[in-house]
């Protein structure tokens, strides 16, 4: 029901545009004169309409509908409904009477009756294009497939009606079929006269289809027509970020946020602004904008993750880790393995930073625990064991205890089964094991690993020198 009400509200304005008084009728000037009195002198207007309907016009259904529409345009729904009914009583097969009746129903928030009346108008006159369009609009936000079916019927019957492609674009947009929506709008804009709303919708469709260059051009055209259009100013900023035009994006952001009290800002606006600031290394300002986004909407855990990334770029690892923990805690359900991996790697990088040497044991322990979970969750992937090996190398920098040995061996066992294994990773695993056995003075075993490296990378200087030293 709520969707129907929203649809009705959006259509009330369209109803008046799609059903104007027929031009050229001999009584059109009198209707317009009387209509001008409806608001300020309804009695005089009623009397004037009554005079028009005397004599030969007593049963003029076209005139009755024109009068009814004049009342509807002034918000007089009851009077409009009365004239629509009078027209139907005189000629129950007059499609325009049902079209007006449908418009009145829309104004009264009765979408079911409106769609029924529009359908009846189509049944009575298959060339009543407005009825197809209005029926499609009623269902656009409720059952878009019904809208689509009706519009396709109209397009087959009236391929030159430029309004069809515009409405198809709106329906496809509602259905999330942005590629088709873009094509429909392109077809419309080639022959139609775009409005501010058309430019806005088309620019959005281009953005959603990742046609950022094209979207930029449409945004510029739209802003020429409507320089205060909030959505177009938003898209200017969004497009520039996607195109990596960061300076232009910051200029667009300054324009977009020039009125800080605008109630139409959404959390994503602050996220995009923050990303622009981050891209230009204005990290403190970026953090402030990310936090504004969180204040506005805490239902998007990825914001915590982006905050963590900014802190990491500042090498503020304690804050980066704290923000990442906030991210993991805000997730609904268990974190993905990729999330755990990135958290483990963050702790590893913190452990390698000499500025936090006093916290190194804490970071190492956290990283080791997390990478152990990764190895357990995806046993066929080398990453968990490989990064555990790196972490334990920090615990045993001289390789005297061989703390990393079992993890490099486990990673190597997986990697050797993969034809596309990274050469650099294979070299690292074999290098550690070669050096470990060298320290243990087990030279034959050490040579095995150094030779494996030369099989992978014949020009590897470290392996060559190690073998020369053993000889």
Regions of interest found by a model, annotated:
Residues 1-8:
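Bacterial N-terminal signal peptides that target proteins for export
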Residues 447-448, 455-469:
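Alpha-helical oligomerization segments
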Residues 436-439, 451-456:
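Short, flexible active-site recognition loops that position polar ligands and cofactors
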Residues 5, 13, 20-440, 462-471:
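Alpha-solenoid helical repeat scaffolds
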């Amino acid at each position: 029901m709520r969707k129907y009400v929203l649809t009705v509200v959006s259509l009330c304005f369209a109803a008046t545009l799609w059903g104007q008084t027929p031009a050229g009728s001999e009584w059109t000037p009198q209707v317009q004169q009387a209509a001008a009195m409806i608001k300020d002198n309804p009695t005089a207007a009623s009397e004037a309409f009554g005079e028009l309907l005397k004599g030969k016009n007593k049963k003029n259904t076209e005139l009755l509908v024109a009068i009814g529409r004049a009342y509807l345009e002034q918000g007089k729904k009851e009077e409009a409904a009365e004239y629509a009914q009078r027209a139907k009583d005189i000629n129950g097969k007059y499609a325009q009477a049902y079209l007006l009746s449908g418009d009145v129903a829309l104004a009264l928030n009765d979408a079911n009756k409106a769609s029924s009346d529009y359908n009846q108008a189509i049944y009575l006159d298959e060339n009543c294009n407005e009825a197809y369009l209005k029926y499609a609009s009623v269902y656009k936000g409720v059952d878009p497939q019904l809208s689509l079916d009706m519009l396709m019927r109209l397009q087959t019957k009236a391929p030159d009606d430029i309004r069809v492609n515009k409405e198809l674009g709106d329906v496809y947009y509602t259905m999330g079929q942005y590629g088709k929506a873009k094509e429909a709008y392109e077809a419309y804009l080639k022959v139609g006269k775009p409005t501010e709303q058309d430019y806005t919708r088309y620019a959005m469709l281009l953005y959603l289809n990742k046609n950022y260059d094209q979207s930029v051009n449409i945004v510029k055209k739209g802003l020429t027509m409507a320089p205060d259009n909030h959505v177009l100013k938003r898209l200017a900023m969004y497009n520039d970020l996607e195109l990596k035009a960061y300076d232009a994006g910051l200029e667009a952001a300054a324009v977009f946020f020039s009125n800080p009290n605008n109630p139409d800002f959404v959390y994503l606006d602050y996220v995009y602004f923050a990303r622009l600031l981050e891209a230009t290394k204005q990290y403190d300002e970026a953090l402030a904008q990310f936090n504004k986004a969180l204040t506005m909407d805490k239902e998007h855990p990825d914001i915590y993750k982006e905050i963590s990334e900014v802190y990491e770029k500042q090498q503020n690892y304690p804050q980066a880790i704290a923000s990442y923990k906030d991210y993991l805690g805000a997730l609904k359900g268990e974190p993905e393995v990729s999330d755990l991996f990135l958290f483990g790697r963050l702790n590893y990088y913190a452990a390698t930073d000499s500025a936090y040497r006093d916290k190194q044991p804490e970071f190492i322990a956290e990283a080791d625990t997390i990478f152990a979970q990764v190895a357990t969750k995806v046993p066929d992937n080398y990453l968990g064991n490989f990064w555990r090996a790196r972490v334990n190398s920090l615990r045993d920098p001289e390789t005297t205890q061989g703390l990393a040995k079992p993890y490099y061996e486990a990673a190597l066992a997986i990697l050797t089964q993969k034809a596309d294994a990274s050469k650099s990773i294979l070299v690292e695993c074999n290098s550690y094991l070669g050096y470990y056995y060298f320290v243990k003075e087990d030279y034959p075993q050490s040579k095995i690993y150094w030779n494996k490296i030369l099989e992978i990378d014949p020009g590897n200087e470290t392996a060559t020198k190690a073998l020369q030293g053993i000889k």
